[in-house]
């Protein structure tokens, strides 16, 4: 069942893709709180992960982009990383295939909407295993790259 939180009407002249890929603008837009549908989608994306995370766990999100996870993950020991160098990141210019982080550093690692961007998945999984502590958790959330998902991405202005 799809729940529409708020129906949005767009003007014919609005360029809905002008900030596509601009992480800083996406983060500002989200923090304004105007798009209730986006909030709903992101809440569903991240909230279920809290059931796998303990209060004092140390976590990392790889490929965090805007870092929306910090809004929904209740654990305050979550660090965010990305291949980019945006100022909101805890770890900048991190290659998920070779993070250069210490062995056994994290109780959990989140990879949300990342796997379809990873060119060498086996190398990625080996690296995640290396940086996770014994019995650590790799929490993966990824959507289908179907045409429907691509259309929804354009409509929501967010991947």
Summary of predicted features, one role per range:
Residues 97-109:
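A short acidic, Gly/Pro-enriched loop at the edge of an enzyme's catalytic core
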Residues 119-123, 148:
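Short N-terminal helix/helix-N-cap motif within the alpha/beta-hydrolase-1
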Residues 1-98:
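Conserved N-terminal segment of class I S-adenosyl-L-methionine
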Residues 111-114, 140:
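A short beta-strand submotif of the Rossmann-like class I SAM-dependent methyltransferase core
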Residues 139-159:
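Conserved class I S-adenosyl-L-methionine
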Residues 122-137:
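A short glycine-rich, Lys/Arg-flanked "PGG" loop and its adjoining helix->strand segment in the class I
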